[in-house]
Curated annotation (Swiss-Prot):
Catalytic activity: heme b + 2 H(+) = protoporphyrin IX + Fe(2+)
PROSITE patterns documented for this protein: FERROCHELATASE (PS00534)
Primary localization: cytoplasm
Keyword Cytoplasm: yes
Pathway: Porphyrin-containing compound metabolism; protoheme biosynthesis; protoheme from protoporphyrin-IX: step 1/1
The organism's taxonomic lineage, starting at the top: Bacteria, Pseudomonadati, Pseudomonadota, Gammaproteobacteria, Alteromonadales
The family this protein is said to belong to: Belongs to the ferrochelatase family.
NCBIfam families registered for this protein in UniProt: hemH
Organism domain of life: Bacteria
Protein name: Ferrochelatase
C-alpha cells in the first residue's frame, strides 16, 4: 500500500489541535440521480445494514435503488431551501459558531471543521485537509448523542480507514456519545421550556428517536437504553411524571421488527386513548433534517390529526441555538483536557532541519 504523506509539510509549520464535527450526510440535490448516489453509499455500509453482502447487494441494486431515489427526491424537495439541505446548513452554522468560540479562546492553535459520513464533504477529504494544516492532535465529535454502531460506530470505521492509509497519524480522541452529558440535557430541556412559554403544554410530550432493527439491541447495541436515559433525564429536569411523556422510534425501513413503540403507530392510536394534543421532540437529531421536518413535522402530524387529534406541535432540533453551541463547546473542552500546542520556535526548527539536510 502507498501511504498518503503531507506534501505541504515544512518545519516552520506550527502544530495545531483539530476538532472534527461529523454528521450523517445529505444528497447534493433533491434529484433522483443525487439520491441514488447518496443512498448507494449509505445503504452499502455494513454497519447500517447487517445483512449478508451478496443478498443485500441484490436487494439494494435490483430493487431499492430503482424505486426509492425518486420517492426520496420528492420528500427532499419539500424541505430543500435556498441554502440547500437543512442538515448541511445547520451543521455549517454549528461548526462556524464553534470555530468562532475556539478562535476567541485559542487563536489559530485550534482548527474546527465538519465532515459528513456519506456524501460531501467527506471525512477523508476534511481529515486530510486538517492534517495538512498542521493538526497533530485530532478530536472527533459525531453529532449523535446516543451511541449506535450504525452511526457513531460507522463514523469511527470511516476515520480509521482514512488513518489506515495515512503515513503520519495524529493523536486521536473520539467522543462516542454524550446522551447523559448535563449541558446537553439542559439544552434539550431548555428548548422545551422555551416552546412551552409560547405555546403552553400539550397532553403528552413525545421523545421520538430514529429507530434501529431490534436485533441490533439484542446483539448488544446500547442505543435503545441511551435514548430512554436521555428522555428520563430531560423529563426529570422538566419535572414531568411518567404519564406526561413517552418515548417512540421512527423511520423504520424494511419488514423486520425495529425498536418499539413505533412513532407512527403511536400517534394513530393516542386520540382514541383520550390524548388530543401532543408535542414532539427529536433529541437524537442535533440538526433538523428530512426525518424531523418532513417525517415528524408533516407526515406524522397528518396521522395524528386524521386519527382524531386536535393539536400537534413539533419542537425544532437544537441546531445552532446558543445553549446547544455552549453544550457542544463544553463537551469539546472536556475532551481536549491535557492537550496543548507547544509554543515552539518554528524558525529554529526549520534552521536545525536545514542544517541536517532537510529541504522543508
Amino acid at each position: 500500500m502507498k501511504y498518503r504523506s503531507n506534501e505541504t509539510f515544512t518545519h516552520k509549520q506550527a502544530d495545531k489541535i483539530g476538532v472534527l464535527i461529523t454528521n450523517l450526510g445529505t444528497p447534493e440535490a433533491p434529484e433522483k440521480g443525487a439520491l441514488k448516489r447518496y443512498l448507494r453509499e449509505f445503504l452499502s455500509d455494513t454497519r447500517v445494514v447487517e445483512v449478508p453482502k451478496l443478498i443485500w447487494w441484490m436487494i439494494l441494486n435490483l430493487v431499492i435503488l430503482n424505486i426509492r431515489p425518486k420517492r426520496s427526491a420528492h420528500a427532499y424537495s419539500t424541505v430543500w431551501t435556498d441554502r440547500g439541505s437543512p442538515l448541511m446548513f445547520h451543521t455549517q452554522d454549528q461548526t462556524n459558531a464553534l470555530a468562532t468560540s475556539m478562535q476567541q479562546k485559542y487563536g489559530d492553535k485550534v482548527v474546527v471543521d465538519f465532515a459528513m459520513r456519506y456524501g460531501s464533504p467527506s471525512i477523508e477529504s476534511v481529515t486530510q485537509n486538517m492534517l495538512e494544516k498542521g493538526v497533530r492532535q485530532l478530536l472527533v465529535l459525531p453529532l449523535y448523542p446516543q451511541y449506535s454502531g450504525a452511526t457513531n460506530g460507522s463514523t469511527f470505521d470511516a476515520l480509521g480507514e482514512v488513518l489506515r492509509k495515512t503515513r503520519w497519524i495524529p493523536d486521536v480522541r473520539f467522543i462516542s456519545h454524550y446522551h447523559d452529558f448535563t449541558p446537553y440535557i439542559d439544552a434539550v430541556a431548555g428548548s422545551i421550556t422555551e416552546h412551552w412559554a409560547t405555546h403552553g403544554r400539550a397532553d403528552k410530550l413525545i421523545f421520538t428517536y430514529h429507530g434501529i432493527p431490534k436485533r441490533y439491541l439484542t446483539a448488544g447495541d446500547p442505543y435503545h437504553c441511551e435514548c430512554y436515559k436521555t428522555s428520563r433525564l430531560v423529563a426529570e429536569k422538566l419535572g414531568l411524571g411518567k404519564h406526561e411523556y413517552m418515548v417512540t422510534f421512527q423511520s423504520r425501513f424494511g419488514r423486520e421488527e425495529w425498536l418499539q413503540p413505533y412513532t407512527d403507530h403511536t400517534l394513530k392510536s393516542l386520540p382514541e386513548q383520550g390524548v388530543k394534543s401532543v408535542q414532539m421532540i427529536c433529541p437524537g437529531f442535533s440538526a433538523d433534517c428530512l426525518e424531523t421536518i418532513e417525517e415528524i413535522g408533516i407526515e406524522n402530524r397528518d396521522y395524528f390529526l386524521e386519527a382524531g387529534g386536535q393539536r400537534y406541535e413539533y419542537i425544532a432540533a437544537l441546531n445552532a441555538q446558543p445553549q446547544h453551541i455552549a453544550a457542544l463547546e463544553s463537551l469539546i473542552e472536556k475532551n481536549l483536557g491535557g492537550w496543548e500546542c507547544p509554543d515552539r520556535n518554528s524558525q529554529l526548527s526549520a534552521d536545525l532541519a536545514t542544517a541536517m539536510g532537510s529541504d522543508k
